[in-house]
Amino acid sequence: MAYEPQFNPGETKIAENRRKHMNPNYELKKLREIADEDIVRVLGHRSPGESFKTVHPPLEEMDFEEDPMKDIVEPIEGAKQGTRIRYIQFADSMYNAPAQPYDRARTYMWRFRGVDTGTLSGRQVIEMRELDLEKVSKILLETEIFDPARCGIRGATVHGHSLRFDENGLMFDALQRYIYDEDSGHVVYVKDQVGRPLDQPVDMGEPLPEDELKEITTIYRKDNIGMREDEELLEVVNKIHEARTIGGFGMEVFKKDLNKRLGGANE
């Protein structure tokens, strides 16, 4: 019988949204159009039109000794061409952002190949070959995973995910990488992801309305759908907590040694 991954436990809308993100067979809804050159500008790793820098020759030109992995694993395009490793990093507001760090990590690992991802409380980085990174970044910025007001592209100085919004509903950004254009109603990036001024602004589109964000968010919140409303999720979390506590501390395994260290008899 073929294995069908569940992706994420839970019976609520929040759980279903998480499953949609992680499921590579689910087509993420495209919400905006961003030019490839604009994505390159915001990433800040190279200039539009500039060739990709490489760190080794194309794989087909390299002389490999016996290495079974090269026959087992199909390299991604950037690896084939030898392009360098680069990154994009997001900060997601805890106030109903479409994605959040652990959701991003699991989504990246399910959907993309050749990725290295790091998870922190208020930011999520994805590193991969630059050629492939730009293609992945386009997906992450144009689809329902991203909202220009609640998600920030921040390679440095990421603070703001837990802070209140400004008067235009934008998440706080200490480097002020983006602004709200009152004429168009769109969020516009005026700096790249590490805070360097751009030669020309990049339009990221209109922020999603609050009602829609509550429908697509992957964050449990008391003022939307609380975690305690999801019985299946709570059951899984409790099982993991119990297994880690009992098995992780290994109280039974080290019972005699622990008793001796506490001054008791070594039975």
Curated annotation (Swiss-Prot):
Free-text remark on how the cofactor is bound: Binds 2 coenzyme F430 non-covalently per MCR complex. Coenzyme F430 is a yellow nickel porphinoid. Methyl-coenzyme-M reductase is activated when the enzyme-bound coenzyme F430 is reduced to the Ni(I) oxidation state.
Molecular function as annotated in GO: coenzyme-B sulfoethylthiotransferase activity
InterPro entries per UniProt: Me_CoM_Rdtase_Fd-like_fold, Me_CoM_Rdtase_gsu, Me_CoM_Rdtase_gsu_sf
CC cofactor: coenzyme F430
Pathway in which the depicted protein is active: One-carbon metabolism; methyl-coenzyme M reduction; methane from methyl-coenzyme M: step 1/1
Stretches that traverse the bilayer: none
EC number, as in UniProt: 2.8.4.1
GO annotation, biological process: methanogenesis
Residues holding coenzyme M: 123
Keyword terms, alphabetized: Methanogenesis, Transferase
Enzyme class: transferase
NCBIfam families for the chain: met_CoM_red_gam
Oligomer and partners: MCR is a hexamer of two alpha, two beta, and two gamma chains, forming a dimer of heterotrimers.
Similarity remark: Belongs to the methyl-coenzyme M reductase gamma subunit family.
Free-text function comment from the UniProt entry: Component of the methyl-coenzyme M reductase (MCR) I that catalyzes the reductive cleavage of methyl-coenzyme M (CoM-S-CH3 or 2-(methylthio)ethanesulfonate) using coenzyme B (CoB or 7-mercaptoheptanoylthreonine phosphate) as reductant which results in the production of methane and the mixed heterodisulfide of CoB and CoM (CoM-S-S-CoB). This is the final step in methanogenesis.
Protein name, UniProt field: Methyl-coenzyme M reductase II subunit gamma
